[in-house]
C-alpha cells in the first residue's frame, strides 16, 4: 500500500533541487552535498553559488552544451576546467543557517566555513562569483537554486498565516505568540474564534495535540535512571504566532511546527509508581519545534527537533536541569519516534517515543513524548473542501501498526501453548492398550518409544 501511494505522490508532486558541484583540490565523487556542508571548515569551505531560477537546463545552455561553440561563461568554464566535477540533486533544503551571505563583493570576509554567493539572475550571480571565487582557497563550489539552501535570507516557503501577513512578506520577523488558549492544541488554528487563520489551497498541514509526557533520563555510575510525568491538556494552555508553522506547497520539503505551552498546575514526575523524581511549577514554559521532512520518494518523517525552553527541578538523586538556548537534535534522536508516514496520509499516535534534548547537566537529558496527536503535512484528496473547512484527511495511519509489542507477546505465548497442547495430544495418541482377555500373558499397556 505504501509503495502505491509513494508512486502516486511522485506523480502528484515531484520536486528536487538540481546542483553542479566542482572543486580543484577535493575529490567529491559520490559525496552528497549535505555531507560536504556538514564537514566544511574555514580551511576547506563550501561555496554555494545561487540564483532563484537555477536548473541543470539553465547550466547546459550557459555551457553551450547544445552547440559546438566554446562557452565564454565564467562559471561554465570553471566547472569544465576543474579537476573534480559532477551534477547532483537532492530532495530537500540543505541547512546553511550560519553561512556568510554575499550579495556584493564588499560583504566578503575570510574565515567562514560556508559562503552563499547570491545573484538575482544568472548574469549577476556569475559576475559576483568571478570576483569572489579566487579569494576562497581549497573550496568546493555548489551551483544551485536559492531555494535549495536553508538560510534566513533565502526562505522559499510561505508561512501559514493570515491574509494580511501573506500579503506583506514571507520573510518578516517572527511575531510574538498570543497565548492562553485551552487544549486541545490545533495549529494552524483555522477558523477559530480566538485566532482565525484562513485555509489556503496548497497549504494543508495540520498539527493536533492533547497532552505531553516529560521523560527525564539521568546517568549515574554508568546506570541510566528514568522518571516521567504525564501532563494532560487540562494542565496546559498554548500560544500561537503567525510564524509558528512552515508549510510548503507540495509533499516535498521541510514542514515545521513550533509549540509554545504553559503549565497551569504544578507537576510531579515519578520514578516507578512511588518515588518522586522531579517537579515542574505552574507558569513554567515548554517551547519546542518539530521539523518533518517530505522526500522525493513519497515518504515523510520527523527529521529534526529543537527545544528552547524546558526545565525541571530534581529530587535526590535526580539533578535539576534545563535546556539552555536552542538545542537541536536529529538523526538517531528522532528516527525512532515512529512519527512517519506516506505523502498524502496523516498520522495518528496515542503516544510517541520521546525525543531527548541535552541539558546544562551533562548526565541529564529531558525528553518530550507526544500524547494523542495527529499530524498532517499535505492533503491532496479534496482541495476544494479543504478551503471551505480545514480538516484531516480520512487516509490516516497509526503509529502503533498492526502488531504491537503486546500483540506479539500474546501471539508467541499462544503459539507456545498450542505447540505444547499438540505435543501432549500426539503423545497420548501413541499410547496403546491391550485387551487382557485376548492374551493374558501379554503386557496390558504398551507405550511406543520413538527415537
UniProtKB/Swiss-Prot annotation:
Known glycosylation sites: 191, 235, 249, 330
UniProt cross-references to InterPro entries, sorted A to Z: Ac45_acc_su, VAS1/VOA1_TM
Entry's localization field: Membrane
Cytoplasmic topological intervals: 429-451
Transmembrane regions listed in the UniProt entry: 408-428
Keyword RNA-binding assigned: no
Keyword Membrane on entry: yes
Pfam families: Ac45-VOA1_TM
Effect of disrupting the coding gene: RNAi-mediated knockdown at the L1 larval stage causes arrest followed by death at the L3/L4 larval stages. RNAi-mediated knockdown at the L4 larval stage does not affect development into adults. However, only 26% of the progeny hatched into larvae which die at the L3 larval stage. RNAi-mediated knockdown at the L4 larval stage or in the germline causes egg compression in their uterus. Fewer oocytes are produced in the oviduct and are endomitotic. This results in a reduced rate of ovulation over time.
Disulfide cysteine pairs (residue numbers): none
Signal peptide: 1-16
Membrane protein topology class: Single-pass membrane protein
A GO-annotated cellular component: proton-transporting V-type ATPase complex
Assigned protein family: Belongs to the vacuolar ATPase subunit S1 family.
Name used for this protein in its record: V-type proton ATPase subunit S1
Protein encoded by which gene: vha-19
